[in-house]
Amino acid sequence: MRRRETFRLAAGGSVAGLLSPRIARAEAEVERARRGLPSPKIQDVQVINTAPRGLRLCVVKILTDQDGLYGYGCATFTQRADLVGPAVERYLKPFLVGKPADRIDDTWQALYNSSYWRNGPVLNNAISGVDLALWDIKGRQAGMPVYQLLGGKLREAADCYSHASGNEIAETLDNARALMERGFRHVRIQV
């Protein structure tokens, strides 16, 4: 092999290495088009306020233009749950309707960076609900749980914790012990 041929092959390999992610994305788009699955567009954004066991939760539901394709995301900020819903409905919804549901990172960046003050806890929780709902849509489209889309299972189970509080330190400690007797290995204490 001559020097020029070696250089040409090496250069070709480098270019192919740079282009391969783009080619893979393009091939995926072609495959999607062949299957007749256009990119879903966000048609509506709804807020569901709920309070299991008295804990106020705000859930975001995103509906797409594809029949039966929707996603749920939790936008919980229990201290200001009554503000998260209006943030989704009045601020985020007008921006989201009509946008592609499969451009998750693009959407997150636009929502996060669109506010002069970089949002704060209420709007950040609203954005997290939208983000989770969009991932739920992608998982439903793929026919698999979101954790598989993100690389698969890391462990079989995850430890949960509970919260112990009380009016006095002794009461708080008693509540923590009771939780540990119920099987919790981790207890958050607030004095």
Q: Model-derived features: where do they sit?
A:
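C-terminal segment of N-terminal export signals and the immediately downstream linker at the start
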Residues: 20-53
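Metal-dependent enolase-superfamily TIM-barrel catalytic cores that perform enediolate-based chemistry
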Residues: 156-191
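Short beta-strand elements
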Residues: 58-66
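Residues that line or immediately flank small-molecule/substrate-binding pockets and catalytic motifs
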Residues: 49, 77, 191
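Metal- or metallocofactor-binding catalytic centers and their adjacent structured scaffolds
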Residues: 65, 69-141
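Short, basic and Ser/Thr-rich N-terminal targeting/leader segments
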Residues: 53-56, 128
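Glycine-rich, aromatic-flanked loop segments that form ligand/cofactor-binding clefts
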Residues: 131-165, 171
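N-terminal export signals
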Residues: 3-26
